[in-house]
Swiss-Prot record:
<keyword id="KW-0460">Magnesium</keyword>
<feature type="binding site">
    <location>
        <position position="255"/>
    </location>
    <ligand>
        <name>dimethylallyl diphosphate</name>
    </ligand>
</feature>
<comment type="similarity">
    <text>Belongs to the FPP/GGPP synthase family.</text>
</comment>
<feature type="binding site">
    <location>
        <position position="103"/>
    </location>
    <ligand>
        <name>isopentenyl diphosphate</name>
    </ligand>
</feature>
<keyword id="KW-0444">Lipid biosynthesis</keyword>
<dbReference type="GO" id="GO:0006695">
    <property type="term" value="P:cholesterol biosynthetic process"/>
</dbReference>
<feature type="binding site">
    <location>
        <position position="93"/>
    </location>
    <ligand>
        <name>Mg(2+) 1</name>
    </ligand>
</feature>
<dbReference type="InterPro" id="IPR008949">
    <property type="entry name" value="Isoprenoid_synthase_dom_sf"/>
</dbReference>
<comment type="pathway">
    <text>Isoprenoid biosynthesis; geranyl diphosphate biosynthesis; geranyl diphosphate from dimethylallyl diphosphate and isopentenyl diphosphate: step 1/1.</text>
</comment>
<keyword id="KW-0479">Metal-binding</keyword>
<keyword id="KW-0753">Steroid metabolism</keyword>
<keyword id="KW-0808">Transferase</keyword>
<feature type="binding site">
    <location>
        <position position="97"/>
    </location>
    <ligand>
        <name>Mg(2+) 1</name>
    </ligand>
</feature>
<dbReference type="GO" id="GO:0033384">
    <property type="term" value="P:geranyl diphosphate biosynthetic process"/>
</dbReference>
<dbReference type="GO" id="GO:0004337">
    <property type="term" value="F:(2E,6E)-farnesyl diphosphate synthase activity"/>
</dbReference>
<dbReference type="InterPro" id="IPR033749">
    <property type="entry name" value="Polyprenyl_synt_CS"/>
</dbReference>
<keyword id="KW-0414">Isoprene biosynthesis</keyword>
Amino acid sequence: MADPKSSFLNVYSILKSELLQDPAFEFSTDSRQWVERMLDYNVPGGKLNRGLSVIDSYKLLKDGQELNDEEIFLASALGWCIEWLQAYFLVLDDIMDNSHTRRGHPCWFRVPKVGMIAPNDGVVLRNHIPRILKKHFRGKPYYVDLLDLFNEVEFQTASGQMIDLITTLEGEKDLSKYTLSLHRRIVQYKTAYYSFYLPVACALLMVGENLDNHTDVKNILVEMGTYFQVQDDYLDCFGAPETIGKIGTDIEDFKCSWLVVKALELSNEEQKKVLYENYGKPDPANVAKVKTLYNELNLEGAYADYESKSYEKLVTCIEGHPSKAVQGVLKSFWAKIYKRQK
């Protein structure tokens, strides 16, 4: 039995070669080479957690029955659609954030000769998703639901990104806007729907379920996505760069991070003044003052408290779900993220 990741990568190669021969467009050698290089650079490079989660969830929903080759292929194809969606978001996000590196390599728009061709590449990535769905799912009873699901989640993610961008607008930096409810809204829409709900929703559609009957599952997964982002915010400041694989810049970037929101909540007037004067400034001295304040306020303790409360709440919700198979899916997600260090 090949390991799941290499079987999954084989499906990527099949989907890529189908897209490079799409009959709707007459490729020249140059354009075919461009798209192939763009795909290889942006789609398969990450941890592939979202994509692999579709297969894991589908297996659990099938109560551990052996999947046949077609079922594995289709679940993998949907997993890749999520990875394509992620690639599309990241290519465009990196331009908006003026980022330099992604997954240890230069961002796509920083690659020589790419530059501002990257926004169009993002649009191409987005348009590959319905091409894959049409080719492999058009005859399925849940085809329209799949299209609808991807469209809805993309809309939610783009809207979350918009709230994030307009909150950190240059010249309009206002810490008083930063509240737990704003943080929650950004996270829920920008991250939780596509990273946590979408893989499970794909698997539910494949086993013939109606998503309208699973709003409880959606709510639990969005809650998990929120917890995941709070962890991310915490690790950005308190995680070891060699473990998390990046140097955190949330303080410099004036991000609506859980840490700054919590700090505002716990600060007295004097401490608030330190935040207002130093948060969002690139100078290391300003950043150091914010970090010192975070330690004074014992944000590590506040995070540990948040973590244990989230654990109790989520485990209670999961164990209250009537379906053991669905519980299995939710528990497998939870096991991947609880107490992670990176």
